[in-house]
């Protein structure tokens, strides 16, 4: 799938994400009953790109691994990430970041890069799957589902229209999941 150079870049992003999210946990519990490391979320998003959407684009995998780094870490700044990975990847990460939170959905609506929308679809799918954890309130679940239907479904419908033909069936699967 990936050249040795691309593989090294992905490993670099993987370990930077792991480092940047060190000590952070999500509400979901792992098999031991402990909170899941936050890093597992970004890892699952990247894996969804590969396994579900069958995308083997190095820049997309790196952006998926680092998609929450700007808003949720102190060490992984846009400047550092641009120095390491370049402008294209950091542009995707910035579009996926809720910094600033105001105008986030509007920025995604104005985004004309199907790759960003594909990463967001995998991100949202992972977030929705984690709603099934014990202790998540019905109110929070309903809020997340409503937000997904109102704000994200239009983006995912656009993704289905704008993605390359060879990804269309898999993208439709993510949207319908």
Language model: regions and residue ranges:
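Active-site helical microenvironments for divalent-metal-assisted chemistry
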Residues: 1-177
């Amino acid at each position: 799938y990936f050249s040795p150079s691309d593989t090294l870049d992905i490993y670099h992003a993987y370990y930077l994400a792991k480092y940047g999210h060190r000590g952070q946990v999500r509400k979901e519990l792992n098999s031991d009953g402990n909170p899941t490391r936050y890093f597992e979320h970004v890892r699952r998003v990247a894996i969804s790109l590969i396994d579900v959407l069958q995308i083997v684009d190095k820049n997309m995998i790196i952006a998926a691994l680092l998609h929450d780094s700007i808003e949720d870490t102190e060490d992984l700044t846009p400047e550092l990430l641009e120095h390491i990975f370049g402008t294209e990847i950091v542009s995707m990460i910035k579009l996926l970041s809720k910094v600033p939170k105001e105008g986030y959905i509007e920025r995604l609506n104005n985004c004309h890069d199907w790759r960003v929308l594909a990463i967001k679809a995998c991100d949202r799918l992972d977030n929705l799957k984690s709603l099934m954890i014990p202790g998540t309130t019905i109110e929070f679940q309903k809020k997340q589902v409503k937000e997904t239907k109102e704000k994200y479904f239009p983006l995912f419908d656009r993704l289905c229209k704008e993605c390359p033909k060879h990804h269309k069936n898999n993208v439709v699967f993510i949207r319908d999941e």
